[in-house]
Amino acid sequence: MKFVDEVEIRVEAGDGGNGCVSFRKEKFIEYGGPNGGDGGDGGDVYLMADEGLNTLIDYRFERFHRAKRGQNGQPQNCTGKGSEDLVLKVPVGTRAVDQDTGEQIGDLTYKGQKMLVAKGGWHGLGNLRFKSSTNRSPRQRTDGTPGEIRSLKLELLLLADVGLLGLPNAGKSTLIRSVSAATPKVADYPFTTLVPNLGVVRLDTQRSFVIADIPGIIEGAADGAGLGTQFLKHLERCRILLHVIDIMPVDGSDPLENAKVIISELEQHNEKLAGKPRWVVFNKLDLVLEEEAKEITDAIIAGLDWKGEVHSISAFNRSGTKELTQKVMTFIEELPPEEEEVIDGKTVEFKWDTYHEETIAAHSQDDDLDDDDWDEDDYDVEVEYRQ
């Protein structure tokens, strides 16, 4: 199945049903009181995380989604039926952004999590709601409000503990093949990896972590060059990044300059991503003598003024990979639990959150009644008119 990690959709919540104007009609009661019921609420639109999905491709072909309208109110004080909510299933790791405002609505990071993205319209009020001591036969009612409409951008961000980054042909795919059961394509030409790959590294039955491999990054990626820039977002949720450096590039380029390119592009793309824990992993040590390899790696470390963790491996023959994965596992286990990200420190507000309060308050002011004139039992009073 084709991997699609970004789509644009339009969601429309259901409109609220209108209130009803109706009066009680019975034998021997010529002028019955009001009995018009309220309408039903319109359906909300939710996104729900489904672990059985791993791509957003379905929404590439079906972009418009609308919840049903609430029923209108009925006589005899019958409330209209509220509409069912519309639930759209998306992969775990999906982020929703409002395209019109740029507001990030939220992330779906675990199975079964639901997120409201469009609020259904409120129900209209029937004329029974407007009965008072001074208005025994109200003909007022209110219409249901329209459902909220949003244009959304859905982004799928892979959930992984470890992310691999580096230039094309640095050996990232070979590394993920050597430490996990993942089988990404490996070849001797650039951009063999065209989509992100995930692999599970199991040290024993109780200890494991997920590792992500994205397409290689090239110079100018932050400005749109190559494939890496559109997939860098998949590393945002990783807890640690492994910068894979090819010490013997096939094109004869300088590995130090190649490493500087990656660091520069990372900083330009996202400060948060650039600030994540990052280890340097020198790869392809099997291509040179041990003394020559040490000379090359020492020069790169000095050129980068690198003070962090350094590992030297050969992903092809799996030399040094076991020690690397063990240290990564220990590092992840010692990290403090991740705190749930709060978006802008406030809750997303929807269009009709205060509709009922404002509507009822407005009609209360119109009645202009004193407390002494009002009796809650008036709602149940049956009035008989005689000529």
UniProtKB/Swiss-Prot annotation:
UniProtKB keywords: Cytoplasm, GTP-binding, Hydrolase, Magnesium, Metal-binding, Nucleotide-binding
Annotated protein name in UniProt: GTPase Obg
Compartments, record wording: Cytoplasm
Annotated organism of origin: Colwellia psychrerythraea (strain 34H / ATCC BAA-681)
Family designation: Belongs to the TRAFAC class OBG-HflX-like GTPase superfamily. OBG GTPase family.
Gene Ontology molecular function: any one: magnesium ion binding
Subunit (UniProt): Monomer.
Entry's EC annotation: 3.6.5.-
Cofactor entry: Mg(2+)
Gene3D superfamilies given in the database record: GTP1/OBG domain, P-loop containing nucleotide triphosphate hydrolases
Protein's gene: obg
Enzyme class: hydrolase
